[in-house]
Amino acid sequence: MIVDNSKDFDLKSFLANLTTHSGVYRMLDKHGEIIYVGKAKNLKNRVNSYFSKGAKDSKTLMMVEQIARIEITITPSDYEAYLLENNLIKQHRPKYNILFKDDKSYPYLVISRDKFPRVSFYRGKSAYKKGQCFGPYVSISSVKNTLNTIQKIFPIRQCENSYYKSRVRPCLQYQIKRCLAPCVGLVSQQQYDEQLAILKKFLAGKFSTVLEEISAKMYQASEDMEYEKAQVYRDQLVVLRKLQQQQIVDIQEDKTFDVIGIYMQDSYASIALLQIQNGDVVADRHWSIDAKGQDKTSIMHAFLSHFYLGDEIRNIWPKNIILSKVEFADITDLMNSISQKIGQAINWIIAPAADNLKWLKLAEVNARQKLNIYTSSKSQYQKRLESLKEFLELEKDIKRIECFDISHFQGEATIASCVVYTDEGEDRKSHRRYNIKDIKAGDDYAAIYQAVSRRVSSGLEADNLPDVMIIDGGKGQIHQAEAVFREFGIQDKVQLVSLGKGVERISGKEKIYKGFDDTEYTLDEHNPGFLLLRQVRDSAHDHAIKGQRKKVSANRQSSIIEEIEGVGPKRRKALIMYFGGWQELSRASVDEIAKVKGISKKLAQEIWECFH
């Protein structure tokens, strides 16, 4: 139950009547924002401790001064309390909690839940919603290489469901023996599931088991005189043997473990997680945080809860977890909750012997190195922010910067990009692109006006306007943004600035204009504020170019067919649904093209001539 959600909050009465049950508590400020989330075995004792006379660190004292209301949720057990606490922290990201931000969103291989499943990859932890996950992989290139390897060995489909459902004949993948063509019923459910089961064992690292099973199936097929089937198994074995020579080994679960090292310096902390399989580091991940007022114990405790009680996906969980030496007041409760969450017992090693000590030292060295990089980069970035604030003569610190850039191809396929930087650095998840419509070809001014209008309109509605908005361009571009600002009345809410290369178009000699100020400014090319302006501008430019290229590519795909009189949208769709793509259409004969509904022999001849 949630307790006390009223504006007239009586702290003294609330503390006196608190329950002694386990649960989660939330501290809210006068604006109703959650500033801290905590978990307790005894809510009464834990919440009252914040208001007792005992010694407290400066961060806790600062937080207590801001508490305007407290809410609690009673849970049936400690386990549910841990899970709820973790979910609330991720949802609200309270400023006084220890917050972890993964250094990247890792890709996973996913086997879908379809009747004839497909294998594909997804980035991020939402992958588990798509099907059975394997990973995470350390990079996009590694997961793509694995997909390519899978396709050579296991004829499991990788196509999108929309493509799969539209097939009326096998695609090229079937012809080169990389798919069993379940789309047109050329394989039974049993045969497909058999290949799928072997693939899952392969992805789980059961390499020897896979070799044994395929060998047995090959010999059985040969004895049954099913020679084509035996040849398929033989071809699989050939590729697998080559992989074996490249040192792919079995994953032995008793030799699979995680190592977690922590390093602290000043008010910062870094955690390194090494994932070990058969004596090899298969993945290393890092988290660096601001940890003012925290100690190693509280940081490690928060990390274990964040990582192991969160939505991390692992097809093999470690049986051993090695930790930096820290003291836990309720380590047993946390360990039990983690074991319950992942469904197996874990051996926690806090003081490792010589065999495992080397791994812990390696993790701690990694944590230290990452923290040095993090603090150095953060310090440099803060200097740039402060320098830009000084140049723009702003009273408040800069918390959010947005930059707009326009890209088009010969006046067509116009894209506006908007990149976001916060006081923590680049915020890639907030980047976005705008498709620009209903303007004259190549009209950058109109494109800027449209993009900024759409952003300001949504920003006012969501109350998330930036502190600084940068426009890539000169006087003409910034005047368009100024017109939008006047229209919405936000001249005093957002600092507008533009960065253009000027007549000379020399990098480092850019001309700067402030909003509603026609003065032309220049800064030394080594000025920290100028470097930040260029950094953000270049990021926006790259983001725009990538979006524009995608749009041009999409527009070109059907341009060849569009030139043929008599082939409209319906017939183009029919052609794609029948052949599965332009490439396969280009290989088709006139007679094959004429089989498509609505395509006459004469029209089929014209289409064929387009590609030949």
UniProtKB/Swiss-Prot annotation:
GO terms for biological process: nucleotide-excision repair; SOS response. It holds the Pfam family UvrC_RNaseH. Coiled coil: none annotated. It is found in: Cytoplasm. InterPro entries: GIY-YIG_endonuc, GIY-YIG_endonuc_sf, GIY-YIG_UvrC_Cho, RuvA_2-like, UVR_dom, UVR_dom_sf, UvrABC_protein_C, UvrC. Keywords: Cytoplasm, DNA damage, DNA excision, DNA repair, Excision nuclease, SOS response. It comes from the Bacteria. Its main location: cytoplasm. GO terms for molecular function: DNA binding; excinuclease ABC activity. Residues 208-243 form the UVR domain. Residues 20-98 form the GIY-YIG domain. GO terms for cellular component: cytoplasm; excinuclease repair complex. The UvrABC repair system catalyzes the recognition and processing of DNA lesions. UvrC both incises the 5' and 3' sides of the lesion. The N-terminal half is responsible for the 3' incision and the C-terminal half is responsible for the 5' incision. PANTHER family: UVRABC SYSTEM PROTEIN C, UVRC/OXIDOREDUCTASE. Belongs to the UvrC family. Interacts with UvrB in an incision complex. This is UvrABC system protein C. It comes from Francisella tularensis subsp. novicida (strain U112). The lineage of its organism: Bacteria, Pseudomonadati, Pseudomonadota, Gammaproteobacteria, Thiotrichales.
